[in-house]
């Protein structure tokens, strides 16, 4: 009877130890999972940056198949100030947030407007661009100059963008959704669309660079604050990126990069 009792007690002690060890292992796993991206970047010396890679002048491939653009210059400068290198990963727009949440990259620096809906899924840094949407038509069009004018018109916008929201705010607008900006610019020039809505910086750059037979016809419809998106729970990383961005603005580096790509001073909030 005593042997049975001793054996039972030993079994209970062993079980308790196993549970304790299992608990510690789980705690370590949970702790590792909560490690801020800033630590991973510091260890690897690489900051993985995602964007579409097809959105000039923000992010696009040049003739040498190298990424360049405003977002690229901003990313490289932030990475330098964090003591790491930027690695660029081109991802389709509708896969950016999903890829971020799957840890395929560390940060999205790709003209993502800060919205309440997106803030449910990701955290944003301070805005690194303030811009706005505009109406764009063919050169001969003169009857679409304000948002109300798109009623009854075929309107091209990027699916899942704030431009889609702007277009859908007008009852009676025939809104067509696209995946690539180049596709709806082409449809506009080929008269399959009456008007498109997109970012004023992007459109002014592309009209000038590519000598497109289209024009911006409206004032800025709404101002958008563009932030860099990171996974939730990475407060240290967000703080470091914000600090680097502030330094860039204070020492004139940000303004220099902005003027390089857009030829004007940055738009205020």
Residue ranges and their predicted role:
Residues 17-20:
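C-terminal motif of bacterial Sec signal peptides marking the signal peptidase cleavage site
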Residues 22, 72-81, 159-161, 227-265:
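Extended ligand-binding regions for polar small-molecule ligands
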Residues 30-111, 251:
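Extracytoplasmic small-molecule ligand-binding "clamshell" domains
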Residues 45-51, 147-160:
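Short loop->beta-strand "edge-of-pocket" segments that line small-molecule binding or catalytic clefts
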Residues 53, 130-137, 200, 204-242, ...:
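Periplasmic-binding protein-like
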Residues 80, 85-149, 215:
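Acidic, polar ligand-binding/catalytic clefts
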Residues 84-85, 101-110, 153-154, 189-202, ...:
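Alpha-to-beta junction loops
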Residues 88-98, 142, 160-162, 176-190, ...:
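Short helix-initiation/N-cap motifs at beta->coil->alpha
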């Amino acid at each position: 009877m005593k042997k049975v009792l001793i054996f039972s007690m030993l079994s209970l002690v062993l079980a308790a130890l196993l549970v304790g060890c299992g608990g510690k292992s789980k705690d370590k796993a949970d702790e590792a999972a909560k490690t801020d991206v800033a630590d991973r970047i510091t260890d690897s010396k690489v900051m993985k940056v995602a964007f579409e890679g097809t959105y000039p002048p923000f992010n696009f491939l040049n003739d040498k198949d190298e990424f360049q653009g405003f977002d690229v210059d901003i990313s490289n400068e932030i990475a330098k100030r964090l003591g790491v290198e930027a690695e660029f990963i081109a991802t389709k727009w509708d896969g950016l947030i999903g890829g971020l949440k799957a840890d395929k990259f560390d940060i999205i620096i790709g003209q993502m407007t800060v919205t309440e809906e997106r803030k449910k899924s990701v955290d944003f840094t301070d805005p690194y661009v303030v811009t706005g949407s505009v109406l764009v038509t063919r050169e001969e069009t003169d009857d679409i100059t304000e948002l109300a004018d798109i009623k009854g018109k075929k309107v091209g916008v990027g699916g899942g963008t704030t431009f889609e929201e702007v277009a859908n705010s007008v009852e009676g607008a025939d809104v067509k959704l696209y995946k690539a900006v180049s596709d709806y610019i082409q449809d506009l020039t080929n008269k399959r669309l009456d008007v498109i809505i997109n970012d004023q910086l992007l459109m002014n750059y592309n009209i000038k660079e590519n000598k497109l037979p289209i024009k911006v016809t409206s004032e800025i419809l709404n101002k958008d604050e563009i932030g860099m998106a990171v996974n939730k729970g990475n407060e240290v990383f967000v703080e470091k990126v914000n600090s680097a961005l502030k330094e860039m603005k204070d020492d004139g580096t940000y303004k220099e990069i902005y003027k390089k790509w857009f030829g004007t001073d940055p738009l205020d909030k």
